[in-house]
A protein has these predicted regions:
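Extracytoplasmic loops and strand-loop junctions of Gram-negative outer membrane beta-barrel proteins
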Residues: 1-9, 60, 89-97, 154-158
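Conserved small-residue
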Residues: 1-13, 53, 73, 133, ...
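Residues that define the transmembrane beta-barrel architecture of outer-membrane proteins
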Residues: 15-19, 102-107, 124, 166-170
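Outer-membrane beta-barrel pore domains and translocons
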Residues: 26, 37-39, 131-135, 177
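Repeated loop/turn-to-beta-strand initiation elements of outer-membrane beta-barrel proteins
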Residues: 29-34, 118-119
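Membrane-embedded beta-strand positions of outer-membrane beta-barrel proteins
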Residues: 34, 128-130, 174
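Extracytoplasmic gating/loop element in the C-terminal half of outer-membrane beta-barrel translocons
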Residues: 39-127, 131-133
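C-terminal beta-signal and terminal closure region of outer-membrane beta-barrel proteins
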Residues: 57, 67-75, 89-91, 139-178
Length: 178
């Protein structure tokens, strides 16, 4: 980012810490497992929000138009169109769309039951489980999932550019042991 010809760093896309807690509980054939994960630190950038603001189709730009403009530094009222065309452009203010990438989520939850061996004539063990992934974003400072990426290349980490929402999945596991 350049300011008066000098460059400054908005932050690193890499987190300071990645945390995870996995736990599995079993009682009388009933199984409960969960995975909580967290990412602390790092920054992410929303090119989606910048473009929506630039073209005047975001909620923020609509609210600013309805309010008669944008109050800059608490003193100067600037037209919403001029403000968002300036900050939303590629030469605008990327720090306006840069967010802390810290987030905590329930990454996985499973609930299962193992049928008693005698039900299968002591020949096998059958376990049935319901499993869910990416079930709950407990806390996130960015207005999007900072762990979603548009590309696996090194140059696109931490950038939201009209990405699809994070997928939540539910499934059924069947485990048969002989």
């Amino acid at each position: 980012m350049a300011d008066d010809g000098k460059e400054f760093l908005l932050g690193s896309v890499f987190p300071e810490y990645n945390l995870a807690w996995r736990n599995d509980l079993t009682w009388k054939g009933l199984h409960l497992g969960f995975l909580l994960s967290g990412r602390i630190g790092g920054v992410c950038y929303s090119a989606t929000q910048a473009n929506l603001d630039l073209y005047g189709v975001s909620k923020a730009s609509a609210d600013a138009r309805d309010a008669g403009g944008v109050l800059v530094n608490g003193r100067q009222l600037v037209s919403a169109q001029k403000w968002y065309q300036k900050v939303g452009s590629q030469s605008g203010l990327p720090q306006y769309y840069t967010y802390d990438a810290t987030n905590f989520r329930l990454q996985e939850l499973s609930l299962g039951y193992t049928l008693p061996r005698k039900w299968l004539k002591d020949k096998a063990t059958l376990t049935l489980s319901i499993v869910g992934h990416n079930l709950w974003m407990i806390w996130c400072k960015a207005p999007f999932d900072p762990e979603s990426v548009a590309s696996t290349g090194n140059n696109y980490q931490g950038i939201d550019y009209f990405m699809m929402p994070s997928l939540r999945s539910l499934g059924l596991n069947v485990k048969l042991d002989f």
